[in-house]
Amino acid sequence: RKLTGKTNDATKQEVNPINHQEKTFKQKLMLFLRGNLFIPDPRVTWVRPSVRFLKKYLKEHPVDAIVSTGPPQSMHLIARKLAAATGLPWVADFRDPWTRMFYFKHLCLCGWAKKKHQRLEQQVLDDATVVVAVSPLVQEDFQTMTDTPVELITNGFDEDDFDQVVEPDGYFNITH
């Protein structure tokens, strides 16, 4: 925001890597910084304080397993450190791919930054107890990258959960 003078929402639009409009120098700089300094994503600043807090929290509130969901992929980095520190099993749930995401090639990455993304992705895939993918293609892709089991849980719903649904009475109903 300090570089652009824009609000958060405006800044996000301006540095959208897949926006095909010609980018200004500031936009290109923001995209370069985002891709090369904030690896794997801008939430990387959460990793250290989250791990510190959660280590203490888990001592007082034990759990059976750690589950991380990304993106943002930084959540997997938090979970990886917690799993290593606690010895707990870890489920890494990927809602989208990481380095094979369609916009990844638009991040203006230096060679070393691209390699760091790939190394972090590989560490997450290898160190998780199990990986969850959202689509068969992502599942197949991850299975070629790691020996860790990769399970498939697609987005959607189970029709059996809705077999008792009452038919609408002709009015538009909104429920929450």
Language-model-detected regions and their locations in the chain:
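Carbohydrate-associated surface elements
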Residues: L137, G156, P168
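A short, active-site helix/loop in glycosyltransferases that binds the activated sugar's phosphate group
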Residues: Q123-V150, E159
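Conserved donor-binding/catalytic core segment of Leloir-type glycosyltransferases
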Residues: P168-H176
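A conserved catalytic-core segment of Leloir-type glycosyltransferases
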Residues: R1-R48
